[in-house]
Amino acid sequence: MRTFPGGVYALTRETPDTERLLAEVEAALAGGVAAVQYRDKSGDVAQRHAQASELAALCRRFGVPLIVNDDLRLADLAGADGVHLGRDDASIREARIILGPAKFVGASCYQSLDLARAAQTAGADYVAFGSFYPSPTKPAAARADVALLARASRHIALPVVAIGGITAANAAPLIDAGADSLAVLSALFDAPDVRRAAAELNRLFAAEPEE
């Protein structure tokens, strides 16, 4: 089983403009993002399948995994590298049965170390916590404490992803606390230069941790 890569985890915006979507993701990949998550809950079935399939092919060119948010069937049909599941989605065990041992299964654990322990027991490949900062895409999301990342690093033997309002200006404390990956949407795809924004975030993982 592969280990989910650490670094910048790009979360795509929802858009019917597939050409724009692919151009933005390609720029993020060129900037060094480690993984991409396709998120779209409003498009029709045909659009979502087409976008996910094209993104999977694009990510393969860069050797970067494409994860599909919430939709196990789409992840399977589009040839994605895995699925990310929330508490109301399919079970981790079901995802593992359908996708097999070589694909990634990630789990949203919100602010709960207990959910992370359960996800690990069920066979997840990574766990995600948040929201750590106010999020433009999910303004009502409950906030997580940065100390949760340190506890997770001590007690969970899986890569830890931080999510929620993350920018290059506020990301360092999350990495210092134990985040292996930063899931980012607005700070990447609302930036005037997506490639440069990805590279700036990526450089944070090479910086020396603060004492």
From Swiss-Prot:
GO biological-process terms attached to the record: thiamine biosynthetic process; thiamine diphosphate biosynthetic process
Sample GO molecular function, one term: thiamine-phosphate diphosphorylase activity
Cofactor names: Mg(2+)
UniProt-listed InterPro entries: Aldolase_TIM, ThiamineP_synth_sf, ThiamineP_synth_TenI, TMP_synthase
GO cellular component, one term: cytoplasm
Residues bound to 2-[(2R,5Z)-2-carboxy-4-methylthiazol-5(2H)-ylidene]ethyl phosphate: S135, P136, T137, G165, L185, S186
Cofactor note: Binds 1 Mg(2+) ion per subunit.
Residues that, per the record, bind Mg(2+): D70, D89
EC number, UniProt record: 2.5.1.3
Pathway listed: Cofactor biosynthesis; thiamine diphosphate biosynthesis; thiamine phosphate from 4-amino-2-methyl-5-diphosphomethylpyrimidine and 4-methyl-5-(2-phosphoethyl)-thiazole: step 1/1
Keywords annotated in UniProt: Magnesium, Metal-binding, Thiamine biosynthesis, Transferase
Gene3D superfamilies given in the database record: Aldolase class I (3.20.20.70)
PANTHER family assigned to the protein according to its UniProt record, in alphabetical order: THIAMINE-PHOSPHATE PYROPHOSPHORYLASE (PTHR20857), THIAMINE-PHOSPHATE SYNTHASE (PTHR20857:SF15)
NCBIfam families cross-referenced by the UniProt entry: thiE
Functional description taken from the UniProt entry: Condenses 4-methyl-5-(beta-hydroxyethyl)thiazole monophosphate (THZ-P) and 2-methyl-4-amino-5-hydroxymethyl pyrimidine pyrophosphate (HMP-PP) to form thiamine monophosphate (TMP).
Family named by the database record: Belongs to the thiamine-phosphate synthase family.
Protein name: Thiamine-phosphate synthase
Lineage of the species this protein comes from: Bacteria, Pseudomonadati, Pseudomonadota, Betaproteobacteria, Nitrosomonadales
